């Protein structure tokens, strides 16, 4: 059986936490920021934990992470 390959796009976007969850940067922070309130932009800073329903797919994409 050949080695499994890491999905490079996913590897750049997601990090695994010590408990096995995945975290990623929040969306909607790149452009069209003028109409977004300061509160909304502040809350979008940092990272978000990926939903548990999406975790099995990420484990497939990132087998060695």
Curated annotation (Swiss-Prot):
One of its GO terms (cellular component) is cytosolic large ribosomal subunit. Pfam families: Ribosomal_L35p. Disulfide bonds: none annotated. The keyword Repressor does not apply. SUPFAM superfamilies: L35p-like. GO terms for biological process: translation. Keywords: Ribonucleoprotein, Ribosomal protein. The keyword S-adenosyl-L-methionine does not apply. GO terms for molecular function: structural constituent of ribosome. Belongs to the bacterial ribosomal protein bL35 family. HAMAP family: Ribosomal_bL35 (MF_00514). This is Large ribosomal subunit protein bL35. It comes from Heliobacterium modesticaldum (strain ATCC 51547 / Ice1).
